[in-house]
A protein has these predicted regions:
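Short gly/ser-rich loop at a beta-strand->alpha-helix junction or flexible surface loop bordering the NTP-binding
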Residues: 1-60
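Glycine- and acidic-residue-rich phosphate-binding/metal-coordinating active-site segment common to enzymes
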Residues: 49-77
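Hydrophobic alpha-helical interaction segments
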Residues: 66-192
Length: 192
């Protein structure tokens, strides 16, 4: 709610780690609020440790819900599918691939996978499709039609599965991702 009061543009939304928190995709508390804004701005000096504003062009603002937050009114927050897309686009703003995979696992029954695939197409970034497809395979989320659609984004380029981690000497997989986080590491974090 505080974010709504300090942004200077109407096309803002709660995003990344904060949206994951809103949708119950985290297992730990969050101290900072991540807000996408269409006008470059900084949080007030006294709130810089509590807020992070991420600039995005207005045409990229979609997949947003207005959600009632107690008696304080409504806030704009990424829907669960847009939350996943944003997270896979910039894992650094969501704690990395293991946090994202854990969040997908926690909410796997509430996710609209058709909508998620449509959002992948709308973003048109192959790395998002590759990360999502690989995570779905690791977690055994059996949506064959969606996974096959995501495989259509695989080209010759290799990307890092998790850009936050070490960038050398790792195996490559069929999704053309460099495995700097292994499937076993993800499974151990989720199922431990």
């Amino acid at each position: 709610v505080a974010a709504r009061e300090i942004v200077t543009c109407k096309d803002y939304y709660i995003a990344y780690y904060s949206a994951m928190d809103y949708w119950g995709m985290l297992t730990q508390p969050l101290a900072k609020t991540f807000v996408v804004v269409t006008k470059r701005q900084q949080p007030p000096k006294n709130l810089r440790g509590q807020f992070r504003f991420i600039y995005m062009k207005a045409g990229k603002i979609w997949g947003i819900n207005e959600e009632r937050v107690h008696e304080f009114g409504k806030i704009r927050v990424a829907d669960i599918e847009r939350t996943i897309i944003d997270a896979l686009d910039v894992p650094e703003l969501c704690g990395g691939i293991t946090e994202i995979a854990k969040g997908i696992w926690i909410r796997k029954k509430e996710i609209d996978y058709r909508k998620l695939a449509d959002y992948v197409r709308r973003m048109n970034k192959p790395v998002i499709a590759k990360r999502l497809g690989y995570i779905m395979e690791i977690l055994k989320i059996e949506k064959t039609e969606i996974i096959n659609e995501l495989k259509g984004y695989i080209h010759s380029r290799y990307d890092f599965f998790d850009p936050m981690l070490e960038k050398a000497g790792k195996a490559k997989n069929s999704w053309h991702l460099i495995d700097n986080v292994t499937p076993e590491q993800i499974k151990n974090i989720i199922w431990s």
